Amino acid sequence: MKRNIVIMDFSGIYQEEQFYEGEQISWIDLSDISGTNCYCDGDAQAQILERMEKYPVSGIYFIDSGNYHYMSRIGIGRVKEPFNLLVFDNHTDMQLPAFGGLLSCGGWIASALEEVEKLHEVWLIGPDEEAYGQVEEPFKDRVHFLSRERLAEARPYMAEKKGSEEELIRSLEIPANIPLYISIDKDVLCPEEAATTWSQGDMTLEEMLKVLLALCSHFEKENGKILQVDICGECDSDKSMESPKNDHANKELLRFWKKWF
């Protein structure tokens, strides 16, 4: 069966990278659609969905820079069964835009919680405690945080004790009997590991991959289902000299996810 690896090209930055070379990929050119940078209007959403129509939900989707992280909201809108959402991000992405009718990269999770009936709960890995405090009350009952501070506290323990990632995943209590959609913004990584358009966290790529392995192993053991993974966090197209770091991170993430799709 052909693996579904999709490159969603808004900015042209993927043309500066090579992580997908030698892979059977699908390339969706979205660079001609106006009204997409950071915010996405209704007309743009309709055009994007039309171009995605022939591609299945299941698969590995690369969705450009964090300016286009709202693509995750568009992606989960195609899911037809009840599911949970796990997000790696340095930000909560729960700030609804001031203008109605627009989907934003900084508010797509809030939009999903309000509008996607099939979405049960959200797990966010990476934002700091202060960001959690700013989440609006109606959302807090359905959003679970693994904060930047808690990750920092766990880091020495994870480095010393084998199996600590499994303990961390168990502590999150993500149910394996409900399908899971995963979204990764590389801005959760430290600047040495990725170069993004937004402020960054301090997670290493190795730490992320260990946590993902523990999660996927848990789901495999429990016969759970991972619906899709999408990955964003490229740099601006006019800063392509930073692309090698992202290219390496994308290559390692693709290598990892190919084992699970």
Question: What would you call each of these model-derived segments?
Answer:
Residues 66-69, 101-109:
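Short acidic (Asp/Glu) patches
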Residues 100, 104, 200-203:
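Short alpha-helix boundary/capping segments
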Residues 2-63, 67-84, 117-139, 143-261:
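Catalytic cores of soluble, metal-dependent hydrolases
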Residues 96-102, 133-138:
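Active-site-proximal loop->helix
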Residues 85-97, 104, 108:
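Long, hydrophobic, well-ordered secondary-structure blocks that form the structural core
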